[in-house]
């Protein structure tokens, strides 16, 4: 894609441009190219260890790949940087659901709920735990 080509050019010119790697990772996430997303997002967190958003997107990519332990680590890094960001708590909860730890997951979704931007998604996840039959396909 054109966006992919431009981002690849940008990071070739400046291999320390963490946001370029993050944006490429997000693009791959959207395209469901999860291993490439992880590769770029992981690299972006090595360059810039202070941006919660990079760790949030990395956690999301790991969750899509069902790499629960790595998702937990990335989500925890996100939360350590920005405690009130609901997205980090949501990804942490999703990873705990993957680990079959519903009690812990619910606690994390309750934290995510405190962030207005993430409330609806968190409430949906809590409802999935409380009423699993409703969501069975």
Question: Which residues are covered by each model-predicted region?
Answer:
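Structural signature of tandem alpha-helical TPR/SEL1-like repeats
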Residues: 1-9, 30-43, 64-77, 99-111, ...
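N-terminal leader/targeting helix
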Residues: 10, 17-30
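Structural marker of alpha-solenoid helical repeat scaffolds
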Residues: 13, 47, 81, 114-115
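Short coil loop/turn residues that delineate tetratricopeptide repeat
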Residues: 16, 50-51, 84, 117-118
